[in-house]
Amino acid sequence: TQITGSTIYLKNEFEQKTGSFKLRGAYYKIKTLSEEERKNGVVAASAGNHAQGVAYASALEKINCTIVMPKNASPAKVAATRGYGATVVLEGKNYDESWIKAQEIAKTTGATIIHAFDDSQIIAAQGVIGLEIIEQLSDVDEIYVPIGGGGLAAGILVAIKDKNPNVKVIGVESKSFPSMKKSLDSGKLETIEGGFTVADGISVRTPGEQTFEIIKDKIDEIVLVDDDEIINAMFLLMERSKSVVEPAGAAGLAYLVSKKPSPGKKVVPILCGGNIDMYLLGQIVAKGLATMGRMVKIFILLKDKPGALKE
């Protein structure tokens, strides 16, 4: 609050079981399956959080589950997904390539695809987050939502704009993967190449068709953040709130801290996930300390001879 000039209320979805909001949509979708669909099992593609949500929900419902994850997925997320009992298939360089493999598996096995975001039931379940915000903070002015495929933003938009159209909903994307913003700017779905970002959870090349239509009609604005801004927000959360939030989850707060767009307003950034690789976390802590002038690395070139350090 002191840093941004806004009154900030954090929506801690990273404290959900499996570490993100994704369990909401996954569990609701799986609960609606018919007996025949349950027998054939489910398959999903995900970089990590949706994978864990589907795997955990499938375990609760005793349904066979296959998850296709990119080959570069976080080892921690892969291990957690397997830990919930899912069969993990590593395929592709990104979500889109994993999705193609998931469709192939569905065709050959008869399994039901649980889409990460482009599904009306998934969208509806994520929208409950918006209802919870309105119920707990009826005079909220703005909500900041990380956007990858758009399921979370679409659900929250439907819920919030129905209850109070005056509440602004701002989507936040990585500058390296602005697929939804580019799609809105052109008026049609766009597929982008994307670049490197620490925020793997929102690195989606093509938004969903359903999510695009909802966001196009209802979103107030989409803004972009870079990795340095995200890392700064993560470090701030660790130090001030004692909260470990993954890069994608910190995107909304990153924009608030770096741009300070809403002085005097009551705002809610949704911290949508907390599943982060420990090696990456260590790098982020080191960079945060260095940026704040609290850690210095010194590199010294020494000759390979006895007494070189003394000299």
Regions found by a protein language model. Name each.
Residues T1-E311:
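PLP-dependent amino-acid enzyme catalytic core
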